[in-house]
Amino acid sequence: MIEVRDLGVSRGGLPVLAGVNFALSGGEALVLRGPNGIGKTTLLRTLARLQLPLAGEILGDAEDIAYAAHADGVKLTLTVAENLSFWSRVFAGGDPAVAIAAFNLDALQHRPAGGLSAGQKRRLSLARLMVTGRRLWILDEPTVSLDAASVQLFASSIRAHLASGGAAIMATHIDLGIEGRVLDLGPFKAKLPALDAEDLGGFL
């Protein structure tokens, strides 16, 4: 689904990571682990093709990717249901009703997104992933603003996505109880040795 070879990325014109290598297939999840400022967001943005790599290559179809950033990116004047219907039409993707049920948004579906709490907006933002029809989810701290119950809803959506042959790459500090692999990113510096993902079941 995606393969990364000797990838280097930069932030503000300065190299932050180099020699990043991994491959990910359908049904697999990968979490990026490292201290704040190491370059996790920069790496995710590069993998999502939102910025060019400094070096190396990314193999895989960009049209397979759905990206969820720190910002929720919801349309505040549209209702919850209208937001999901909009994105479903844009991506020719899945059924908004399924996403609404998965993230427990039934009682909120007719409420404008601008009237939602921070946690509710985050649930709506993550529900969008389900209507894109994209196989590879790239997620930057997806559980921000979520309470414990909502984290479990998100974890369930990830499990369902993986079970259906999808894949996920994410930066998160929350244990989602999902078996996956971890890619350790070393201390901030311009050059890093090759980074190999290791099995660490239950971390995700």
Swiss-Prot record:
Assembly mode: The complex is composed of two ATP-binding proteins (CcmA) and two transmembrane proteins (CcmB).
Record GO cellular component, one term: plasma membrane
Enumerate the residues binding ATP: 34-41
Q: Which gene encodes it?
A: ccmA
Q: Which reaction does it catalyse?
A: heme b(in) + ATP + H2O = heme b(out) + ADP + phosphate + H(+)
State one molecular function term (GO): ABC-type heme transporter activity
Which cellular compartments is it found in? Cell inner membrane
Give start-end ranges for the coiled-coil region(s): none
- What topology does the record note for this protein and the membrane? Peripheral membrane protein
| Keywords recorded for this protein, A-Z | ATP-binding, Cell inner membrane, Cell membrane, Cytochrome c-type biogenesis, Membrane, Nucleotide-binding, Translocase, Transport
Organism whose genome encodes this protein: Ruegeria sp. (strain TM1040)
Function description: Part of the ABC transporter complex CcmAB involved in the biogenesis of c-type cytochromes; once thought to export heme, this seems not to be the case, but its exact role is uncertain. Responsible for energy coupling to the transport system.
Q: Which Gene3D superfamilies match?
A: P-loop containing nucleotide triphosphate hydrolases
Which Gene Ontology terms describe the biological processes this protein takes part in?
A: cytochrome complex assembly
Protein name in UniProt: Cytochrome c biogenesis ATP-binding export protein CcmA
Any idea of its EC number? 7.6.2.5
Q: What family is it from?
A: Belongs to the ABC transporter superfamily. CcmA exporter (TC 3.A.1.107) family.
